[in-house]
Each structure stands twice: as structure tokens, then as C-alpha cells.
Amino acid sequence: MIPGEYILSSESLTGNVGREAKTIEIINTGDRPVQIGSHFHFAEVNPSISFDRSEGYGFRLDIPSGTAVRLEPGDARTVNLVAIGGDRIVAGFRDLVDGPLEDLKVNVWEGREDGWRRSSAAGDAPQELPQVEAAERGRKLDDATDVDTNVGTEEGFEEGRN
């Protein structure tokens, strides 16, 4: 073997075999292009992407690793999603889950005041967002914007968030 050489299997590989999958319709309602990476928790994608967020909870795009889907403003598209595997722990992204997917049983994206969009075939109105998860993580949030107000402050520095 030569250093850096790839030895490939002669057999074809098929990804995501046996995982739950679904197809949903999305639209970019914003005024800028949006790219969604292959392993991004789909329920937490850019707020200008309109779809029923509960359909994306616990799922990611079913595309090759390291690739992305790009939507120009006004673009509508059908995308294939696949269930997130492994330990099913979601950390980071838009920080709406920040833990095991199974711990959160409510749809936290409905009714958000900070630009989250939701569409439904039934046309039902979004429900009020429960304000528990931020407090449980010990963060001080501005009620109007749901922004961590400790970032950039002396208190935030002591807590390691600056």
C-alpha cells in the first residue's frame, strides 16, 4: 500500500439502510440563498425555510456526507430525510434540542417569536412555545428575543460563553 492510497471495495455501498425515511416539501421564504448541510438537524434549519418543523425533528437530509442542498429565494423543493442515527444526541446547531432527541416530546419550533416559520396542510395556527428548556439549561435569556444576554458580559465571561 502506498501512503495516502485508497483501496476501494468492488461492491457498491448503500447508505442509511434500515433507517426511517420520509419526503417533505420545503420553500425558501427569505431574501437570501440558504444551504443545508448533510448532517444538520433538519428541524433546526434556517428560519426562512418554511415547512412543518415537527416533520424534521430527529431527521437530516438523505444526501452524501459533506454535501448540501441550496435553495435560492422563493425556491420550493421536495427533500428526502433520514433519521439521525447513533446515540441520537443533537448538540449545537440552533441550540433548540441540546441533548438526546427522545427527551423532548413537544414541538418547540411552533409559535416562536424569532422568525421560525411553520406551514401545515391543515392551516392550523402555531401553538405557544413552552419557555422551559432555556431555563433548564441555566441560561439567562431575553424574553423578547430568546437571546443569551450573558454573552459579551462579565457574567458570560466567567461562565465561559465569551
Curated annotation (Swiss-Prot):
In terms of domain of life, where is this protein from? Answer: Bacteria
Q: Does the keyword Cytoplasm apply?
A: yes
Keywords carried by this UniProt record:
Cytoplasm, Hydrolase
UniProt catalytic activity? urea + 2 H2O + H(+) = hydrogencarbonate + 2 NH4(+)
Chief location: cytoplasm
Which CDD domains does the annotation name?
A: Urease_beta
Positions with biased composition (Basic and acidic residues): 134-143
GO BP: urea catabolic process
Q: What is its EC number?
A: 3.5.1.5
Q: List every stretch annotated Disordered.
A: 116-162
Q: List the induction conditions.
A: By urea and nitrogen starvation.
What enzyme class is recorded for this protein? hydrolase
One GO term in the molecular function aspect is: urease activity
Q: In which pathway does it act?
A: Nitrogen metabolism; urea degradation; CO(2) and NH(3) from urea (urease route): step 1/1
Q: Which Pfam families is this protein grouped with?
A: Urease_beta
Quote a single Gene Ontology cellular component term.
Answer: urease complex
Q: What does the record note on quaternary structure?
A: Heterotrimer of UreA (gamma), UreB (beta) and UreC (alpha) subunits. Three heterotrimers associate to form the active enzyme.
Question: Which protein, by its recorded name, is this?
Answer: Urease subunit beta
Native organism = Corynebacterium glutamicum (strain ATCC 13032 / DSM 20300 / JCM 1318 / BCRC 11384 / CCUG 27702 / LMG 3730 / NBRC 12168 / NCIMB 10025 / NRRL B-2784 / 534)
Q: What is the lineage of its organism?
A: Bacteria, Bacillati, Actinomycetota, Actinomycetes, Mycobacteriales
